């Protein structure tokens, strides 16, 4: 009868879930699921200096996330840039119960070795000094917190002080929900910061990467 069919379907789903590798197993494995529906692929065929985190299949060419420090190494050249310190903001301004937000921040910082989702750099490319910032989607999806917004404003200030172009690599979502309207205000301030760069007749280049969502494209990007 129909009840037996539902129970059987549920059991099949449980068995399929058990067969899937855990996050820890996927992270430690040399193999990863293919982005274009083929058999599993070796990570080293995608994450290398030639492919630069892009699928080698000509019919796919899927772009995987690119951590900021790796991106800066590729753009400026290794040891040819410096990481700029950014303002620190007290965590969890809305005091979420059970420290749920603080725990998420702690896990993201351990995973990425970053204070927030945005990293700022100053370096040289072909003899030209350039300021840049990059968003790390591994840090709570690349969501923009108050501290992330302050980091972007710092990048704008550094560009103006040093009279350099400002380049942004946008990868992530919009404002972080754990800070509600406060993070929304921060994103508004980033627009003002970028406008100051433009008022100083300095080039501002935003590069959309995978994945980039509406909150970012509606503000500083």
Where are the regions a protein language model picked out?
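Short glycine/serine/threonine-rich phosphate/pyrophosphate-binding segments
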Residues: 213-220
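Glycine-rich beta-to-alpha transition loops that act as phosphate-gripper elements at the mouths
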Residues: 207-213
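Terminal-region recognition feature
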Residues: 1-202, 211
């Amino acid at each position: 009868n129909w009840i037996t069919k539902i129970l059987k379907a549920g059991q099949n789903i449980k068995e399929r879930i058990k067969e899937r590798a855990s996050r820890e197993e996927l992270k430690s494995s040399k193999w990863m699921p293919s982005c274009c529906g083929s058999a599993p692929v070796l990570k080293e065929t995608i994450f290398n200096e030639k492919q630069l985190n892009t699928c080698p299949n000509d019919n796919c060419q899927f772009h995987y996330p690119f951590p900021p420090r790796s991106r800066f190494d590729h753009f400026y050249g290794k040891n040819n840039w410096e990481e700029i310190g950014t303002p620190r903001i007290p965590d969890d301004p809305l005091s979420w119960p059970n420290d749920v937000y603080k725990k998420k921040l702690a896990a993201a910082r351990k995973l990425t070795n970053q204070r927030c989702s945005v990293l700022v750099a100053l370096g040289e490319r072909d003899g030209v000094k350039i300021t840049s910032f990059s968003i790390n989607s591994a840090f709570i999806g690349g969501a923009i917190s108050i501290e992330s917004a302050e980091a972007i404003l710092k990048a704008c200030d550094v560009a103006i002080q040093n009279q350099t172009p400002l380049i942004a690599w946008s990868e992530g979502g919009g404002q972080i929900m754990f800070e509600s309207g406060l993070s929304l205000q921060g994103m508004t301030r980033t627009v003002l910061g970028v406008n100051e760069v433009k008022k100083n007749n300095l080039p501002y280049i935003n590069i959309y990467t995978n994945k980039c969502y509406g909150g970012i494209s509606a503000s500083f990007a």
